[in-house]
Amino acid sequence: ARLQSIAVAAVSHKPLGRGEGGGQSMVSRVTTVAFQGIEAKPVDVQVQIGPGQVAFTIVGLPDKAVGESRERVRSALIASGLSLPAKRVTVNLAPADLPKEGSHFDLPIALALMAAMGALPAAELERYVVLGELALDGTISPVAGVLPAAIGANTLARGLICPAACGAEAAWADPEMEILAPVSLIQLANHFKGTQILSRPQPKLSANPLVLPDLAEVRGQESAKRALEIAAAGGHNLLMIGPPGAGKSMLAMRLPSILPPLSPRELLEVSMIASIAGELADGKLSERRPFRAPHHSASMAALVGGGIRARPGEVSLAHNGVLFLDELPEFQPQVLDGLRQPLESGETVIVRANHRTSYPSRVQLIAAMNPCRCGHAGEPGHVCRRGERCASEYQSRLSGPLLDRLDLRIEVPAVAASDLLRPAQGESSATVAERVARARRRQSERFAALGVAARTNAAAGARLIEQVAAPDAAGLDLLQSAADALHLSARGYHRVLKVARTLADLDGAEAVSRLHLAEALSYRGAALERRAA
């Protein structure tokens, strides 16, 4: 499928009349992009070479990396056989109120300078969008964000000039799109002269050589495997509580093996975020869903996003995939609470004094934790070293609103020795993945027929899930009594309906029955409270 998205850039060149100093001033314009989230905003790079005191000035709200471009551009031009004229060189990045970040402004500034000096044909540059970083020897280094820029350039029927290392990434925008991916300024200049023709780079898919861990390798834990299948089928969040060594991490690591591959639209979204973060290895796209497992020492900026340049965090890099948080209570409470908005809205918003940045963050949260700091609270014959309050104090690090967003909460007991000695006889990931794929197709077809954008039951809104998961009379009675007994919030009520709808989809049932609701409520039960008691 051809990737479609946001608009970015165009290129133009315009000579001006004589300046006040009596000499002729030349202004060349090359439009590049500045990134806000995965959106590329057009930036007009205006270069003027005119009379006056010899200087090289960059204005237009540049950050430090952009401000340093003057030295990289100057050295790259000298290495390429050109030198700046002994005149006043002014570079304006418009609009001035849009923050300019990153080193990808080097190449458009250099090309605008070369066009103003007559070293490159300005008319040819009008057909391209330009971005790239320059090394001191005139070579062009890779930069982040080439894929969003290429998609936008294709939307405007423009070509793209980007570093050679990013050519494969840019080629995904459209098979007919004109892309120049030079190694150096000299190679690009020779291409425009006709002495060295650059061939179009070709798109690449990651080979994914690593075999994913198989669910059949997990001994015992049949109830946990069932919960994992439900989570995969409906895109539900899952919390596993159990002692050390019970297999919680082992189960989580096998979730990607039963998830369906990315759809073309999901592949686009995932790849654009990876491109912005500079994590698109060799420009190759992968159909596997992201699986991110940050350490519990991760900061707010690392997990949710932020920093000086408002970069995407782990929750955004896991978009359309899995975010696995092991040892959940060991994360800083304020960091975990920062996940509440992305889990609810599917979007991370980072606000700065002068701009607002958002990243898609529709993730499936899989969390694992011990019941207490000792790890064995609630087990027969075990007494916590820290006393009866060990479990309650440990679990109090998790806020109620965060727990309310976890659709499935299960206990993962210690594996019995008999299960470890018995040969593995469980279902393979391929078998479970087939059932998951059928359930997801039912959801996709149902939501498409209703004309809504949701793809999974977990992503459905409250009104929509009430419509598609309306229980029968017996199920309604059970739900009403359980809502009082479990003190379900409005969010908890709707999440029970979502899980019940997924159970019905796994069974191939059109309607949600009492049995589906009963099982959904069992996963909403007070697993934490039982362990803490």
Placement of each model-derived feature along the sequence:
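Peripheral, non-AAA+ core regions of ATP-driven protein-machinery
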Residues: 5-239, 243-246, 351, 493, ...
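Basic, amphipathic alpha-helical bundle interface domains used for macromolecular binding and assembly
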Residues: 59, 65-70, 85, 92-102, ...
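Short loop/turn elements that form and flank the Walker-type P-loop nucleotide-binding site
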Residues: 84-87, 124-125, 155, 175, ...
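P-loop NTPase nucleotide-binding/switch module
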Residues: 196-230, 234, 265-315
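Walker A/P-loop
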Residues: 240-279
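The Walker A (P-loop) glycine that initiates the GxxxxGKT/S ATP-binding motif of P-loop NTPases
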Residues: 242, 305, 327
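Walker B catalytic acidic pair
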Residues: 326-327, 338
